[in-house]
Amino acid sequence: MNDIKVSVCCFTYNHAPYLSKALDSVLSQKTNFRYEIIIGDDCSTDGSQDIINAYAIKFPDLIKTIYQPVNSRGKKNFSDVYKSAEGQYVIALETDDYWTDPNKLQIQVDYLDRHPACIAVAHNCVVVDEHDRQLARKYPAIDQGVYRYKHFRKGLMPGQTTTVLYRNPKFVENLDMSLYNNPISGPGDSRRLFCLMTAGDVITLPYT
């Protein structure tokens, strides 16, 4: 394992209007550890790649880029980015979302560092439209505490995708990710969550 603490896995397809805000929210994180940003573009046609290139040139030590030659409908783009993740912990950020707390990563990393039995930690988030108008008070329905199989069976999630920081499966000996590679067993987020739950606790923190 290298000294990268967190791999921020960014996924974009025609997100040009939102891309800078998403990346700036990652770059504004205040941390005492090293992190990397991996941006996977799924053959965008709206100028997203120009924006990505500008950030990669400006932050060459932080940002890695992966460009799909043809649109993969997410599948290969997600796979290639996750395979490139070298951090001890991993978090996804689809680039039409963004983070609002500059201490977000530090808070979640500190929690996982202090709780070795915990494999993932999430938190609530506010849902907004493309004009930043709030659509919902928060997401998900799990306010805080341990996320359990009873929640999974009801279709509830511990947090929206970009709130979930988890231990990199590459470095977790007892974590079987084979179900994640079975596309007939449900959406990718749910498959990954189910696999993570077999290897440790999933916790939702009481903040947005």
Regions found by a protein language model. Give the residues of each.
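A conserved acidic beta->alpha catalytic loop
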Residues: 41-50, 70, 94
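Short aromatic/hydrophobic "clamp" motif used to bind/position activated sugar donors
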Residues: 90
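Cell-envelope/extracellular polymer assembly enzymes that use nucleotide-activated donors
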Residues: 4-7, 36, 191
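Glycine-rich, basic loop-to-helix element that forms the pyrophosphate-binding segment
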Residues: 68-85, 107
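Acidic helix N-cap motif at the loop->helix transition within catalytic regions
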Residues: 18-20, 46-54
